[in-house]
């Protein structure tokens, strides 16, 4: 497995953001975003893991970096839950590794774009039991959130920021909104923000993420 890209802050780290890229991208995809955020988050380390390369069914079996196989796109995503679980376990291991460096779990954040965001949702609100600084979900969905979703007390205390394009034709806006509503209805402090964009990231969105992180890091 490719080692994560680790961006150290200007000052000794006392917080961390673990940021997962989307389908077909790599660990360098969000490096410019992380570097921009570190200009104001002077004590925040960024960890950018790399998805394994695997065949992706919806792309004709072509091999590409992917956190899990996507078998069908509509009417709802059909995915490999087994591979999703493996990826979520990887994120859990990264959280534990950051804790061993001395960073408190309450100052560790999970962020993910598109497919990476789905892994982040699953890790934080299905698998992880304990405090976390928060979740940042960009242009994503939650394939394992259903009507039966039950959150523990610690999971309910994990704040979340959901950001989505109004014109996203890859992960429809309604799919992201559904994840937001699932969390909101279960008592999570969750914020929904829309932008006039497609399946992408805008400078204003990055600014808003920086402000959200700064407010929680003090």
From Swiss-Prot:
Protein source organism: Pseudomonas fluorescens
GO molecular function per UniProt: carboxylesterase activity
Domain of life, per lineage: Bacteria
PANTHER family per UniProt: LYSOPHOSPHOLIPASE-LIKE PROTEIN 1, LYSOPHOSPHOLIPASE-RELATED
Record EC number: 3.1.1.1
UniProt KW keywords: Hydrolase, Serine esterase
Protein name in UniProt: Carboxylesterase 2
Residues the record marks as active site: 114 (charge relay system), 168 (charge relay system), 199 (charge relay system)
InterPro entries, alphabetized: AB_hydrolase_fold (IPR029058), LYPA1-2/EST-like (IPR050565), PLipase/COase/thioEstase (IPR003140)
Disulfide bonds: none
Summary of subunit composition and partner proteins: Homodimer.
Entry function: Hydrolyzes carboxylic ester bonds with relatively broad substrate specificity.
